[in-house]
Amino acid sequence: MSISSKIRPTPRKPSRMATDHSFKMKNFYADPFAISSISLAIVSWVIAIGGSISSASTNESFPRFTWWGIVYQFLTICSLMLFYCFDLVDHYRIFITTSIAVAFVYNTNSATNLVYADGSKKAAASAGVILLSIINLIWILYYGGDNASPTNRWIDSFSIKGIRPSPLENSLHRARRRGNRNTTPYQNNVYNDAIRDSGYATQFDGYPQQQPSHTNYVSSTALAGFENTQPNTSEAVNLHLNTLQQHINSASNAKETNDNSNNQTNTNIGNTFDTDFSNGNTETTMGDTLGLYSDIGDDNFIYKAKALYPYDADDDDAYEISFEQNEILQVSDIEGRWWKARRANGETGIIPSNYVQLIDGPEEMHR
């Protein structure tokens, strides 16, 4: 066995959610929406506090509660900057939204008292609180919405870090993963229809769905870097590749005829998907790779593989399966970096090819 095969590979990239929440100013500078809106808020606050001080120093009647509103707005701006620097905005979205809503009420109340008052100094103060009210309203729209909302996706598309992960999408995706382990294909179709009817279908249109697919070629464009650079393919596999292709084509044609007679309303799956933690703008062409997620019959698991290392499935990927070291798995197509496999308990999903080793060639399909 080569030295490279003794070293356990690491096919997964670290998730964005596992970042270190230390103080970094670049977290603030990397977000154009944050730096522009907070800068405008600071300028508006300076105008409001300057006009208020000038108006109060001339013995003019000035609403006293406005002082607390101005101080509260300053604390809100400072806390928002700290949340960005520590990368904690997604963790405190509810607190941020409610605190900004309170500041919006304070500023609109102060604007009502100052806008009809006489004097240029009070006019400056009223202009400042009106600008703060507008900025607060924009903040409520942004921080009060989910990261998957159209407005948030459009705003975050200008950020260096890209679109922020959506807790709503991630929770629904993990729920699908747990449901797919213990449900029948009929129940999975009902679950997918329920998500589609609930109004969240647009959030998952880009994800590969578990629907029938009759394509047998597996493209691994989206999984570059995870390949097994030294596949341990036996000579028997190479000798039977041509025969295997003929068997797969005949089995695929038979399955397609059967599926068409049972269901005439099946639709095709889209050719692109967005990864959970991508910037949402990069479209990865999957093509026939979606065949990995289809329901393949027993006759297509024609290889056997032995697990070289234990593997824990990623909770954010509903299609990966876990397995133990030295476990024997049944594998279908072996042309991609990720193979579709089935465990002894019937659990089916995808596994990284560099975690397993083929131990058996293709079996006779009509034995």
Curated annotation (Swiss-Prot):
Keyword hit for Ion transport: no
Modified residues (Phosphoserine): 166
InterPro entries: SH3-like_dom_sf, SH3_domain, Sho1_SH3
Record protein name field: High osmolarity signaling protein SHO1
Signal peptide (residue range): none
Record gene name: SHO1
Transmembrane segments: 33-53, 66-86, 94-114, 123-143
The protein's role, per its UniProt record: Plasma membrane osmosensor that activates the high osmolarity glycerol (HOG) MAPK signaling pathway in response to high osmolarity. Detects changes in external osmolarity and activates PBS2 through the stimulation of STE11 and targets PBS2 to the plasma membrane. PBS2 activation leads to changes in glycerol production that helps to balance the intracellular and external osmotic pressures. Activates also HOG1 in response to heat stress and mediates resistance to oxidative stress. Involved in the regulation of the mating pathway. May be a receptor that feeds into the pseudohyphal growth pathway.
Family classification: Belongs to the SHO1 family.
Locations listed in the record: Cell membrane; Bud; Bud neck; Cell projection
GO terms (BP aspect): regulation of actin filament polymerization
Membrane topology, as annotated: Multi-pass membrane protein
Segments on the Extracellular side according to the record's topology features: 54-65, 115-122
Keywords for the protein's UniProt record, in alphabetical order: Cell membrane, Cell projection, Glycoprotein, Membrane, Phosphoprotein, SH3 domain, Stress response, Transmembrane, Transmembrane helix
